[in-house]
């Protein structure tokens, strides 16, 4: 009888949950819009720097930020490893009624974020020039890269704490505070960039200090939250890292971390290929590195929107899949894919019609600079109109419990297809090979995503019939 009552309560709970009954399109908009805003604000850190550095310092400044970007990617990997892993385990333990264990996991995650940030900052400062050489810096770019990275390294502990800690803040039922933390840092960076670069004449060092101050502000707000406003129970002793907690944190954060590390590897390999083959072309090494840095930031805006749509769809996919409402799962997937495809089409036409204007936002350069940048934007991003399918499908598989396939899907474009192609194609086509590797990798990732998605959606349709 007890089990029957419990089952009835679960059914009633499912029936009343908006995720299972509200119109799917409205639900996606409700969840996706805040996620898109959060992703765009986070992307603005790098984009704003790139714009003002391009306008105030020039092409070599843009190249320097591109060379330095793997440091940020690795820092993000650590933040997601500990932040997502900590937040996920916190929610699981709270759901199981283990409040003390949940708080201990949160404490271990927070202290580990701070420690990992300090360690990464020390490593970057100790091995600054060798790392920048590894990341693709040329002799002309190196002074700018040293100035920029040597300063931004001091902000790494606060950056990692803010990015990772915000996941724990959201898990503590404070999503608005989490969004404010991110936005405050981005706003401060946006205000200080032109002041420091142009007003004080500090050049690329000014951009670096603006970034650090913004990161410190976000990090301090996270610290203030857990000192003053937290809802969870968290004593000082819980901040001492425990190995047993760290293991479970890493287990759930590893997928996101691997994806970021893979991106860092692709960035490093790409920079070095551009440096080598650029030196053997009319463009030289610096122009390709600078241009690719600019265009990667442009692409970040597009990807932020698609990832935001994916994140907004995750609870809808997961809840309805668990409730066996497969028609709503398929409908939510179609809506998400359609939304991303519409956005992708808009970006595609902008890339093809207005390449000069887009590149010009990030500063001026020689005729060769614009020639390479415009060709790269039009060719490398030619398959943009299907590029929203892969991130949506990756999140889709993860949300319905197919985590391994989700990880594979997330790695298809950058690692499985793009990485070998940017190594092989230039052997036969020189620097142009890098450009053509992009659309081929995009097309292959798109086809693979569609094949697996159709297969899984077909299984759901069959299950409904049965």
Locate each region found by the language model.
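N-terminal transmembrane alpha-helices
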Residues: 19-51, 55-56, 70-85, 89, ...
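Transmembrane helical elements of multi-pass membrane transporters/channels
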Residues: 30-49, 151, 162, 185, ...
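Short alpha-helical transmembrane segments in multi-pass integral membrane proteins
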Residues: 1-32, 90-157, 199-254, 317-383, ...
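Short runs within selected transmembrane alpha-helices of multi-pass transporters and secretion channels
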Residues: 83, 152-170, 178-189, 207-220, ...
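Transmembrane alpha-helical segments of integral membrane proteins
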Residues: 417-426
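Transmembrane alpha-helix boundary and packing residues in multipass membrane permease domains
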Residues: 35, 39, 51, 55, ...
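Small-residue-rich hydrophobic transmembrane alpha-helices
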Residues: 62-122, 159-178, 271, 289-355, ...
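Helix-terminus/linker motif at the lipid-water interface of multi-pass membrane proteins
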Residues: 40, 44-62, 132-139, 195-201, ...
